[in-house]
Every structure is written in structure tokens, then in C-alpha cells.
């Protein structure tokens, strides 16, 4: 059963992603083949061409059309004889008014074009990290994850446009190229690492949003639907997959991945009824095989359900605000973003024994949940609870399991420019079978996670301190992490950030694999 023992590390990776079904959120799998590599260059070029070619042409066309129209109007008056001037003088004022109206209409039209074409926002910068705890491998054929592990220039661009009075659209994209791999022997890194971490270009949010009726909002396209009231541990927030390639290093606004959905919001007084249909089946971006956040020694086949009408995911939410406190009910039927392991066959090898063949599958789950948020003075008390049904495991195949997730937390904002947040979450596997403790399932009846976040601003809110900590287990005995960062706004549009990430190994195999992943990081960002 040597293969089973090799698999323990891999299972612990998914054991950790079970906590990411709490999904650590204070923090389209892209296999960049030749086509997507071409997309990497096309996306920035497309936006540049809009600026360079389209905008000047549109403005020039507007100005030329306006000038030609004005000349045509005035030319008729230039041809008239002087003896007719007095007779026509009464019409001159009206003509002037017509010209003024046309100029106003043209100016308004030109302004609307400018707003539609020039309403861009985005950011550009460079993100770096340095792994100081890990030594370079003695074997030069192995990947070197010591020293500079990231030197990543990036660029993101968002175009927002208003379409009439009740509709608007958004198109956003993001691209990066990591120079750190070229600074080392790139041939020692796995193909999965290079394809997923060296470069990436993707379209993110692409949607059309509007209100066909006063009480109804419609949103169609790639989007993010965030459910729940928690800041760092997620319970009912199950619709969007997440980017977990660098565990603990990704912020909330970046961790959720937009996917193709249709969302309807219907308003009834203080209530909102939300209905969601997810058309695109896509799962978490996990650390690639061979990466410093993936300790597994073997690759497994992942079975991804086809995006079809039959596999459409659904969600319903009833959200209300009552005298200052908020409550919501949630229901969803979806594929679990975290795969389970299925034993597809067992081969008997003489001298070794039974060798199983593993495969990653995604269970079809049904979730019912509730959230509550109550302000009280300087405190905000919040809670989430959900029951998930339909969970599958490798070692117990004769039944489906359910799990109950509960979260409680509080935010305190009584200090000036300061926020303190504490959250505590438990995942309880119902009708637990002791067989599930063995590999490859490696399940626990109860998983416990606690997080604390402290944020404070200084120097007229231009310097921002952010401290985040998480511990696994009742007393942190299974591991944890600490992240510290300090951001300074050099000017309105330019900021720099520096910090450190420390991992606590504990008794959890996955956190033990991160013991030498401690690093310092730096980012410079220009926003426009």
C-alpha cells in the first residue's frame, strides 16, 4: 500500500480545502496552451487599441459632423443678397436658436460617447515575495522555491458603460507575467506550475445588468454572487469558486472567481428575493502539482462535469432588513468545489499487495442555510449556519453524508479608525463513520477554525495596518497562520504594501508542509 502512504500528503491538501469550504476569504483554472498564451497578449492589446484608435476616431467624427452641419446651415445665408437681409432678419433669430439646439444635441451626444468609451478603471503594478525559510535544493534538478518566488508585473482593466436609463454593462480583464521563474532554471518546475503560475490572462466580470421593472433587477453574464455576513470564514457563500493557489495570501476581492450566471432580484418592501442559475461549471483554482503550496507526490485525474442544462446549479435567497438588523435564508443545489476521492479500481500486485487507483470527483450537494447580523452599539454580532447534504467519500460508499456548518462572530469599531473582528467556525460531519479517518478520506468528525483580524489607519488614513491570524483546532494544535501587512498611500492613485506571512505547522500534515513557506512580500500599485 505504498501508493496510499504517498497519497496522505495530497489528501491533506484537500483536508485543508475543507477549511476553505469555510473558505479562508480574508485572503478559470487556466491551462495556458498556445491559444490562451495568445490571449495573454491580445487582451492588453485590445484595450490599448480602444484608447489609441477608437476614441480619437469617434471624437473626430463627432467634431467633423458637427462642423459640416454648421457650415451647411450657414452657407444658405451667405448666398442671399443684401436686399433680402432685412426681409429675412426675422428668421435669423430662429435659425440661431436651431443652431444652438443642434449644437447642444451634438455636444450631449458627444459627451455620452465619451462617457461610454472613456469610463475605464483599473490598476497596474508589481507583486513580489521572498521565501526566506526554505533552502535551495542540493539536487539541481529539483525546483528551487527558496529566495525570490514571485516577481509579478500585473495589469487589470475594467470598462463600465451605462446603456440608457436602466441598463449598464461591465467588462473586466486581468493579466500577469511572473519573471521569477525565468530568473531560475525554469525546466525544473512542473508543467502545471509554469502553465498556471508563470503567466495568466483572463476575462473576469462580463455582464449586463438592468431593471426592466421598478421591482425587478436582472444581471446576466460572468459575475460574483457573495452570500453571508462573515469576513473570513464562509458558510453559505457557496456559489463562486475561489483562487486558493497561494493559501492565505489572497484577499477577499480576488479570491472569488466570477462565473457565468443569471441572477434575478425581486424587491418586496424590505425583502429581496434572489434567484440564481449558474450555467458554467468551474471549480477552485488549487495549488498546481509541483508547487510550493502542493505537497502531493502524485497526480490524480479530476472528473469535471460538463456545463449543460442538466448540470445547471441553482440558488435562492430571501434577504431582509428589519429595524437595523439583517437576516437571510439561503438554498442552493450545486457541485462541491472541493473534490472528494473515489477509488475506481484496485490492482493486486505480487509482493506489494492491493494498489488502488484514485480519481477526483465533485459531489452534487444541496445546501440550506440562514444568516443573521445584529448591530449593538460599537459591536456587530453575526452568525451563519448551514446543512450540506450529498457528500461522498472513498471508504464508505453505501450512503451519502451530510454536514452541519456553524459560524459566530463579532466586529468591534469603537476605536477611531480601527476595526477588530473575531470569528469562530465548526464543521460537524453527521453520522460519522470511523472508517473516514483513514486515508484517502482523512476526515474528522469536527473541524474547528478561529480567526482574528485587526485593521487600523494612521496619518490621516494614508497608512493602513492589517493583522490577520487563524488557528485550526480548539487550541490551534492543528496549525495556523499569521499575516501582517502595512500599506501606505503615497498619493491618491499610488500605494505600496509590505508584510510577512508566517505558517504554524501544528499536527496537521498540510500545515506541516507549509512550515518552510514563511515569506515576506511587497507590492506597488497604481490605480486609475
Name each model-derived stretch.
Residues 160, 165-294, 323, 503-505:
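Outer membrane beta-barrel
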Residues 59-168, 172, 180-181, 195, ...:
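N-terminal periplasmic/intermembrane-space "pro-region" immediately following the signal or transit peptide
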Residues 244, 502, 516-528:
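Outer-membrane beta-barrel "beta-signal"
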Residues 126, 153-161, 171, 205-210, ...:
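Residues on the lipid-exposed face of transmembrane beta-strands in outer-membrane beta-barrel proteins
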Residues 166-169, 215-218, 270-273, 324-327, ...:
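Repeated loop/turn-to-beta-strand initiation elements of outer-membrane beta-barrel proteins
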Residues 126-132, 175-179, 224-226, 268-270, ...:
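Transmembrane beta-strands of outer-membrane beta-barrel pores
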Residues 162, 373-393, 397-471:
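Detector for outer-membrane/organellar transmembrane beta-barrel domains
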Amino acid at each position: 500500500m505504498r501508493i496510499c502512504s504517498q497519497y496522505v500528503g495530497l489528501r491533506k491538501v484537500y483536508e485543508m480545502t475543507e477549511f476553505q469550504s469555510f473558505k479562508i476569504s480574508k485572503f478559470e483554472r487556466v491551462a495556458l496552451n498556445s491559444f490562451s498564451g495568445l490571449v495573454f497578449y491580445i487582451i492588453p492589446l485590445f484595450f490599448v487599441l480602444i484608447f489609441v484608435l477608437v476614441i480619437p476616431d469617434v471624437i473626430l467624427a463627432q467634431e467633423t459632423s458637427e462642423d459640416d452641419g454648421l457650415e451647411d446651415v450657414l452657407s444658405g445665408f451667405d448666398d442671399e443678397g443684401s436686399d433680402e437681409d432685412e426681409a429675412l432678419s426675422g428668421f435669423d433669430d430662429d435659425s440661431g436658436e436651431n443652431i444652438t439646439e443642434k449644437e447642444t444635441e451634438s455636444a450631449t451626444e458627444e459627451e455620452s460617447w465619451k462617457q461610454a468609451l472613456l469610463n475605464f478603471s483599473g490598476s497596474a503594478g508589481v507583486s513580489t515575495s521572498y521565501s526566506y525559510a526554505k533552502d535551495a535544493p542540493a539536487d539541481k534538478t529539483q525546483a528551487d522555491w527558496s529566495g525570490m518566488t514571485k516577481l509579478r508585473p500585473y495589469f487589470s482593466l475594467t470598462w463600465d458603460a451605462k446603456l440608457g436609463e436602466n441598463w449598464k454593462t461591465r467588462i473586466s480583464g486581468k493579466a500577469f507575467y511572473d519573471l521569477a521563474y525565468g530568473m531560475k532554471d525554469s525546466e525544473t518546475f512542473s508543467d502545471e506550475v509554469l502553465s498556471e503560475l508563470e503567466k495568466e490572462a483572463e476575462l473576469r466580470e462580463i455582464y449586463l445588468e438592468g431593471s426592466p421593472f421598478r421591482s425587478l433587477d436582472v444581471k446576466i453574464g460572468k459575475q460574483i454572487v457573495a452570500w453571508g455576513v462573515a469576513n473570513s470564514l464562509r458558510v453559505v457563500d457557496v456559489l463562486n469558486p475561489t483562487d486558493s493557489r497561494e493559501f492565505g495570501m489572497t484577499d477577499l476581492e480576488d479570491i472569488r472567481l466570477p462565473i457565468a450566471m443569471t441572477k434575478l432580484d425581486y424587491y418586496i418592501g424590505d425583502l429581496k428575493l434572489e434567484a440564481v442559475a449558474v450555467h458554467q461549471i468551474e471549480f477552485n483554482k488549487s495549488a498546481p502539482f509541483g508547487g510550493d503550496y502542493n505537497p502531493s507526490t502524485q497526480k490524480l485525474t479530476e472528473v469535471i462535469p460538463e456545463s449543460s442544462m442538466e448540470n445547471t446549479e441553482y440558488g435562492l435567497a430571501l434577504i431582509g432588513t428589519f429595524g437595523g438588523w439583517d437576516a437571510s435564508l439561503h438554498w442552493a443545489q450545486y457541485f462541491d468545489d472541493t473534490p472528494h476521492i473515489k477509488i475506481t479500481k484496485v490492482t493486486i500486485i505480487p509482493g506489494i499487495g492491493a494498489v488502488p487507483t484514485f480519481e477526483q470527483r465533485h459531489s452534487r450537494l444541496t445546501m440550506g442555510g440562514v444568516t443573521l447580523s445584529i448591530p449593538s452599539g460599537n459591536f456587530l454580532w453575526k452568525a451563519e449556519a448551514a446543512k450540506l447534504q450529498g457528500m461522498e467519500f472513498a471508504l464508505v460508499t453505501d450512503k451519502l453524508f451530510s454536514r452541519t456548518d456553524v459560524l459566530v462572530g463579532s466586529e468591534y469599531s469603537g476605536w477611531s479608525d480601527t476595526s477588530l473582528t473575531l470569528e469562530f467556525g465548526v464543521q460537524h460531519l453527521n453520522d460519522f463513520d470511523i472508517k473516514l479517518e483513514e486515508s484517502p478520506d482523512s476526515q474528522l468528525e469536527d473541524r474547528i477554525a478561529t480567526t482574528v483580524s485587526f485593521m487600523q489607519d494612521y496619518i490621516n488614513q494614508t497608512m493602513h495596518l492589517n493583522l490577520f491570524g487563524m488557528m485550526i483546532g480548539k487550541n490551534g494544535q492543528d496549525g495556523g497562520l499569521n499575516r501582517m501587512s502595512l500599506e501606505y498611500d503615497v498619493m491618491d492613485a499610488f500605494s505600496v504594501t509590505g508584510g510577512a506571512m508566517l505558517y504554524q505547522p501544528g499536527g496537521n500534515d498540510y500545515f506541516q508542509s507549509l512550515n518552510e513557506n514563511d515569506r515576506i512580500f511587497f507590492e506597488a500599485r497604481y490605480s486609475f
